[in-house]
A protein has these predicted regions:
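Active-site-adjacent segment of SDR/Rossmann-fold oxidoreductases
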Residues: 125, 164-173, 228
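C-terminal substrate-recognition "lid" of short-chain dehydrogenase/reductases
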Residues: 210-237, 242
Length: 244
């Protein structure tokens, strides 16, 4: 397998949650990391969290719904080795009969179309032999709760995106990581005061008997970057949640 020592890795969504966990793990393996997020405040906090990286971290603010900002991002980043995208905001959660068209449109624009645009502009400066790794989620693999139609549809689309792009962009490798529930700021925002009870119930049902942290999910992204013979695949890192 390849090594990340001396490689440049761009992490879209790297200012918090899974993306920040991937950034920390990537730095531990000797890479240079570029974290990208929408919020300058979160980026500054992430830089402080990663402050032991001896200047190997840079941060860029960019909105993934704005193609001009994505294009400028990769112009500024210039040549790099690996792309990781964990970006995406809170999904719509209303039942279909109460779904608001504009809320759905914004989520699709942010999560799916944003991924397309990131791939479009990243490939201009991605080095030969590099990789792209996107993020889907558990909703595509198990019966979703009522109100989960939109997020399930988008999560499912990423497997097909990776398969198509792995052929179109070869030899660039394109893969997807599909996590289950992860203890992140986004989950806390969605669950509110119910988070603790939800986590306790789910952990008791999972074969892994615990809820993942970003550090539990990060090794899958490392594998996707380092494994030179893995492309077009979806890696299910869910503690067995897709089985229950």
């Amino acid at each position: 397998m390849a090594t990340l020592v001396g490689k440049k890795v761009v992490i879209v969504g790297g200012s918090s949650g899974i993306g920040l966990g991937v950034a920390a793990s990537t730095l531990e393996r000797g890479a240079e990391v570029v974290i990208v997020g929408r919020s300058p405040q979160r980026l500054q906090a992430a830089e402080r969290t990663l402050a032991t990286a001896d200047g190997r971290v840079r941060a860029f603010a960019a909105d993934m719904t704005q193609e001009t900002e994505i294009a400028r991002l990769f112009d500024d980043v210039d040549a790099f080795d690996h792309l990781v995208s964990t970006a995406g905001g809170p999904p719509p959660a209303d039942p279909i009969n109460r779904t608001d068209r504009e809320i759905v449109r914004r989520f699709i624009d942010d999560k799916l179309i944003g991924a397309f645009m990131v791939a479009k502009h990243a490939v201009r400066v991605l080095k030969t032999g590099g990789s792209m790794t996107f993020t889907s989620g558990i909703n595509k693999d198990r019966p979703p709760v009522p109100g989960g139609a939109v997020v399930s549809a988008i999560a499912g689309s990423f497997s097909y995106l990776a398969r198509a792009l792995s052929l179109e962009l070869a030899p660039t490798r394109v893969n997807v990581v599909s996590p289950g529930w992860v203890d992140t700021p986004l989950f806390a925002e969605l669950a509110g005061e119910a988070k603790l009870s939800l986590f306790e119930d789910m952990a008791a049902r999972l074969p892994a008997l615990k809820i993942a942290t970003p550090a539990d999910i990060a090794p899958a992204y490392i594998f996707a970057m380092e494994s030179e013979f893995t492309t077009g695949q979806t890696l299910h890192i869910d503690g067995g949640q897709s089985l229950i």
